[in-house]
Amino acid sequence: MDMMLLVQGACCSNQWLAAVLLSLCCLLPSCLPAGQSVDFPWAAVDNMMVRKGDTAVLRCYLEDGASKGAWLNRSSIIFAGGDKWSVDPRVSISTLNKRDYSLQIQNVDVTDDGPYTCSVQTQHTPRTMQVHLTVQVPPKIYDISNDMTVNEGTNVTLTCLATGKPEPSISWRHISPSAKPFENGQYLDIYGITRDQAGEYECSAENDVSFPDVRKVKVVVNFAPTIQEIKSGTVTPGRSGLIRCEGAGVPPPAFEWYKGEKKLFNGQQGIIIQNFSTRSILTVTNVTQEHFGNYTCVAANKLGTTNASLPLNPPSTAQYGITGSADVLFSCWYLVLTLSSFTSIFYLKNAILQ
């Protein structure tokens, strides 16, 4: 009661600033004796959420032109009436009209988060309004696993850490047609990784404040080479012939060719060898009898070696369209001779009749 009389006396003597400070002191727990509190009528509490970087306007209104106001942030005085106590250039008082005493904070940051109190000193009793400002922060991935190369069968852990307010949720996605969804979380564990699980993994952090933050990790899976196919086309003496060997492996395998036990080299005896990352083509520019035989394609990388063989044989009677046993061949020639005989008799008959 003595405090209220002192405040009113200060107001009556036009020392309103002292009155405001005394009323603010009543709002601060540090100014009160232990175990005591002061409850003001017409007090209100509001919550306000603002995205980081935006402008926050904390509303407060004076009852009439004679009343005075003040703004506090925790125990720090920001404004007392029209006097600015804060050195922060981002804060100001809104002056849309005589009753408006709203606090404006430009380019809000996480350090602005917290409670704010507007105290209005009238001729009768002080009125307070409290606003809790929550600064929302868009998600930001600040740490993610580097691109990596591992061997098939290895256990792999991918890491994706992000900040934001509210705390962002983390989700993973394997960028591939046959991808399966993963459980959400900062860490993605892949046990016994296979070659099909190689590729890019996308980490997405989102909290509905702004667009998700997305980063990617590339995972290369090494595996020993395999030969998927080896085949040749029709081989005719005097013409070109080729054998194609299709393989796979990471790192890409190196290809070699052998005829029997003998290694073949590019340019040797009319042989051309073309090697690609997943294919090797052996071409014989002018096939002769000595080129026929068994050819072996060998694919090797640092994880292993594999091979496949294919015989290169001379053309058979099949290429002329006549196949079968001796009896079948005899029947075919008998049919041709019989048709020839009938044709000769027909022409002889016509000659006699004429």
Curated annotation (Swiss-Prot):
Family annotation (Pfam families): I-set, Ig_3
Residues that carry a glycan: 73, 155, 275, 286, 294, 307
Record keywords, A-Z: Cell adhesion, Cell membrane, Disulfide bond, Glycoprotein, GPI-anchor, Immunoglobulin domain, Lipoprotein, Membrane, Phosphoprotein, Repeat, Signal
Disulphide bridges, residue numbers: 60-118, 160-203, 245-297
Record lipid sites (GPI-anchor amidated glycine): 324
GO annotation (BP), single: positive regulation of saliva secretion
Sequence ranges assigned to domain Ig-like C2-type in this UniProt record: 38-134, 139-221, 225-313
Domain of life of the source: Eukaryota
GO cellular component term of the entry, any: postsynaptic density
Positions of the propeptide removed during maturation: 325-354
Bilayer topology annotation: Lipid-anchor; GPI-anchor
Modified residues (Phosphotyrosine): 187
Subcellular location: Cell membrane
Annotated signal sequence range: 1-37
Family according to the record: Belongs to the immunoglobulin superfamily. IgLON family.
Role of this protein: May be involved in cell-adhesion. May function as a trans-neural growth-promoting factor in regenerative axon sprouting in the mammalian brain.
Protein name: Neuronal growth regulator 1
Source organism per UniProt: Homo sapiens (Human)
Gene that this polypeptide is encoded by: NEGR1
